[in-house]
Amino acid sequence: MMKQSPFSLLTSIFLIAALFTATTALDPAPEDPIFELYMHDILGGSSPTARPITGLLGNIYNGQVPFAKQIGFVPPQNGVAIPNANGAMPTVNGINGIPLGTGLSGTAFSGQNLNGIQTQLGPDGLSLGFGTITVIDDIITSGPDLGSQPLGKAQGVYVASSADGSTQMMAFTAMLEGGEYNDNLNFYGIYRIGSAMSHLSVTGGTGRFKNACGFAEVRPLIPAGQHFVDGAEMLLRIIVHLKY
């Protein structure tokens, strides 16, 4: 049996390593798919996409005003909520600015809330919106403007999950009907109001997203204002990192 010299063995090892490196460079591992969505959450106005259904705020939208005197609300006539001139339910009490709605931008007062979180507390020390469940049917577009290419709807709920009103627990399905992706994708996690970025988990989906997993970076943006919205709009930029 012919013996192989140490030099020949070392040369063979180097050749195999070089061949493996070249093969890897020619056929790199595929990167995880990344795509971008813009979600428009509109509370109040004539065409809302979100509505509180439980808690104090839900009662207001349903025409009931509990604890009116204690927290400063002016009782409507005959216990029935008074709509605006356009027939929509008001989101802000016009007399004292007490919030009638809360969403992903925090408690809403008269004017835009761009200076951080403003929280109205009840007599028990909890925010007025604590425990409020808001149902959403938000529009998803390919760009930040509401008139951008529509990609589908985000349907689900978010819940005011912190006593100080600083977080919302989100659970929704992005029903994508346009563009490259045409299936459903599920999201779950905590959205931090006033934070530059929050993270949501991707918890599966349907079709090509059946076994999807990953995460989404959620960043709040100020709407461009090219399309007039008479409610309170919260624009979210969602960057999705997927494995499936």
Curated annotation (Swiss-Prot):
Entry keyword set: Apoplast, Secreted, Signal
InterPro entries reported in the protein's UniProt record: Allene_oxi_cyc_Dirigent, Dirigent
Gene3D superfamilies (UniProt xref): Allene oxide cyclase-like (2.40.480.10)
Protein's UniProt keywords contain Coiled coil: no
Entry's Gene Ontology BP terms: phenylpropanoid biosynthetic process
GO terms under cellular component: apoplast
One Pfam family matching this protein: Dirigent
Domain of life: Eukaryota
Keyword Secreted: yes
Subcellular location(s) per record: Secreted, Extracellular space, Apoplast
Signal peptide: 1-25
Family note: Belongs to the plant dirigent protein family.
Function summary: Dirigent proteins impart stereoselectivity on the phenoxy radical-coupling reaction, yielding optically active lignans from two molecules of coniferyl alcohol in the biosynthesis of lignans, flavonolignans, and alkaloids and thus plays a central role in plant secondary metabolism.
Subunit structure, as described in the record: Homodimer.
Protein known as: Dirigent protein 18
Taxonomic source organism: Arabidopsis thaliana
